[in-house]
């Protein structure tokens, strides 16, 4: 009697194991799709990390480090930019802002990535220490919101479209 129960339990366990294993087998198409999704998620995560590191480098005033994140052909455009900025002209623009607002910082508020594109909402803020476009320094903190949409190529920032709240900035 014990032998029959043992054989039945053993057979049942083998069936359960066999059934479980057949359900765990992933088709080649499913594996390929999973691998592509995983690679895309890793790319998006890396691109978001790079965007964060760019703003950290700017906040640290480390423009040489900032340069390492950009492709040689980088350009920045936007509705209020009459000419595209190259990386060199972008750094000059940031340095001019820092000359007026020595404590100027960028704070990443939100970020979304899809494929090779990252959209980031930032807040910029600082206290004006020098004249800015004819405006005398004030003791209060000034802030400006901005949206950057950046496209990557081979892990480097290739182009950025920017929209800043310059009107609110001038108030």
Residue ranges, per PLM feature:
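Bacterial Sec-dependent N-terminal signal peptides
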Residues: 1-34
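Hydrophobic pocket/interface hotspot
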Residues: 51-54, 65-67, 74, 90, ...
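Exposed beta-sheet edge and beta->alpha loop/turn motif
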Residues: 123-157
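Low-complexity, intrinsically disordered terminal/linker segments enriched in charged
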Residues: 30-33, 158-171
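Carbohydrate-interacting regions of secretory-pathway proteins
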Residues: 56, 68, 113, 168-170
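A solvent-exposed, acidic/Ser-Thr-rich amphipathic alpha-helical stretch
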Residues: 63-115
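Short beta-strand segments enriched in hydrophobic/aromatic residues
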Residues: 70, 112, 124-126, 163-164
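Short, low-complexity N-terminal intrinsically disordered segments enriched in polar/charged residues
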Residues: 24-72
């Amino acid at each position: 009697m014990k032998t029959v129960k043992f054989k039945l339990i053993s057979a049942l366990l083998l069936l359960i194991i066999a059934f479980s294993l057949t359900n765990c087998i992933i088709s080649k198409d499913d594996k390929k799709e999973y691998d592509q999704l995983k690679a895309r998620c890793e790319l998006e995560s890396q691109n978001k990390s790079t965007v964060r590191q760019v703003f950290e480098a700017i906040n640290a005033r480390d423009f040489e480090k900032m340069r390492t994140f950009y492709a040689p052909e980088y350009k920045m455009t936007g509705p209020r930019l009459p000419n595209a900025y190259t990386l060199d002209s972008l750094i000059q623009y940031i340095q001019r802002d820092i000359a007026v607002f020595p404590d100027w910082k960028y704070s990443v508020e939100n970020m979304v990535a899809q494929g090779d594109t990252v959209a980031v909402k930032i807040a910029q803020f600082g206290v004006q220490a020098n004249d800015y476009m004819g405006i005398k320094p004030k003791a209060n903190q000034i802030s400006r919101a901005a949206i950057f949409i950046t496209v990557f190529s081979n892990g480097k920032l290739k182009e950025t479209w920017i929209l800043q709240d310059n009107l609110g900035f001038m108030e």
